[in-house]
């Protein structure tokens, strides 16, 4: 079976709360790091989430 091109990543909150989301991304279409605005339930507002490596 062929290995998939999608890689698992972690989106970590820039608010410093320690909250994170996990998702996948296609490395061929998006080689740069992602920066997405999502809801942080700890801070109770929308903040930027930066891509980090999933350990």
From Swiss-Prot:
Spans through the membrane: none
Keywords: Ribonucleoprotein, Ribosomal protein
GO molecular function, one term: structural constituent of ribosome
GO terms, biological process: translation
Any one cellular-component term (Gene Ontology): cytosolic large ribosomal subunit
Superkingdom field: Bacteria
Entries under Pfam families matching the protein: Ribosomal_L33
Keyword check for Protein biosynthesis: no
Family: Belongs to the bacterial ribosomal protein bL33 family.
NCBIfam families found in the cross-reference section: PRK00595.1 (NF001860), rpmG_bact (TIGR01023)
Name by which UniProt lists this protein: Large ribosomal subunit protein bL33
Organism: Bordetella avium (strain 197N)
